C-alpha cells in the first residue's frame, strides 16, 4: 500500500466511532431469612416486622438486594432443618439463620439443637449459599451447663462452616431493669413479654444490619 493509501487507512481508523463499554450491572442479591416468629414479624402490622424493616434499611443504604421472609412462628431448629431445602431455592444467594429461641423456651437439649443447626448449615454449604448465623443468648433458667452449651453452639458452628456470625438477635433490646435483673427492655417489647414491638425491631435492624451487609457482599461475589 502506498503512502497515500496508508494515510487514508489510518484516518478511517481514527474516524471510526468508538463503541462505549457497557457498564457491568451488579445483579440483585437474594437473601432468605430462615427463622421463627422473630423473623416472621409476629404481632406486628404489615411492614413493621424484621424482614420489611431490614429491607427498607438496606434499600436506604443503596443495596440491590431482595429479602425473602422464611420465618415461621413457633418454629424450632428441627422445623428449620425440615424446610431448609426448599428455602434454598435456585435464586437464593445468601441465607440468614436465626433459629433456636423456641428450642430454648421448650428446654430442648442443646445437643439436639446443635445437630439441627449443623444440618441447616451443611445444606447451605452443599448449595453454595453464603450464611449469616444470628445467635441467641440463653438465660440461666436451665442451669449454667445448659446455658454454656446453648450459647457456644452458634459461634462454634459458624466457625466450622465458615459462616458469618452475629452474637445475639435480641441484644439490642436487652439490658438490666431497675432491680438489676437482666432481661428485655419493656419499651421495646410487646405485651406478651417475648416479641419485639416495631420500635424494638428498628433497634434490632440497626444492630444486625452491618452483619447483613457483610453477607450481601459475600453473596454478591461472582
Where are the language model's segments positioned?
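Alpha-helical cap/lid subdomain in secreted, periplasmic
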Residues: 63, 79-222
